[in-house]
Structures are given as structure tokens and as C-alpha cells.
């Protein structure tokens, strides 16, 4: 959604409590557009909370540290942890970057420093032992883990 369209839609719906940047594709792939939109919403609707749902690979996508920059406009971040190891992550996510899992964990640690709220998320379809391992990964970093229910 472009800033102009978003602005007109938001004027109609002032009752929104939260706007989430997410969807099919990674929002930080269009970092400048996302930040411009977030800045606009922040200026026009300061009471609306802004959240980013991300794969956590923004630093790699944009070739620079991004958590602090994003946190200037976004209140909270939810990072798709997906699974409990680099090998399983590569199998499930098929990232284009080497060491993507480690990069995602680094982004999460940076995000925790800058955002009001940082969380990891997984879907409840992975094995119970992997869920427990994901919980440990989150706990070791002091980051909340959200376990989402799978829905068709």
C-alpha cells in the first residue's frame, strides 16, 4: 500500500489500535517504503501501535544493521524463529543467505535492545521437542516466544 492510499484509509478507520507490517514477502525488503509509511502513520495517527512481523533477515537484505533504524518508527517486532536449529531452518525456510539462522538470532538480540516489545514466533506444527528447544532459545535471550496455532 502506498502512503497516499494508506493515509486515506487510515482517516476513515481511526478506531484501529494497531497496524502490522507483514504478509507474503518480507516487509524489510522494501525498507525505505516501509519506514516512510510508518513515519506517515506515526505523524497522522500517533495512538496507533505499529508492529513488524519479519523473518529477521533485514540486516542481510539491506546490507547494514537495521533494528535501531526500524525502531524509530515501529513499536514492536515479531520474528519468525520457525525452528530450533540452523539445519532445520535451512530445510524449512530455504534462505538465500548463508548462516541465515544465526543472522536472524543476531537481529533478534539487537531488536530486544531497541523495541518496546520483541518476540519470536513459531507454529505449533513442529515436534514438541523442537518447541521446547525454541522456548530455551527464546528464554536464553530474554525474548518472549509466541506459539501460534496452525490454521488452514
PLM segments and residue spans:
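Flexible, charged surface loops at secondary-structure boundaries
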Residues: 13-15, 71-72
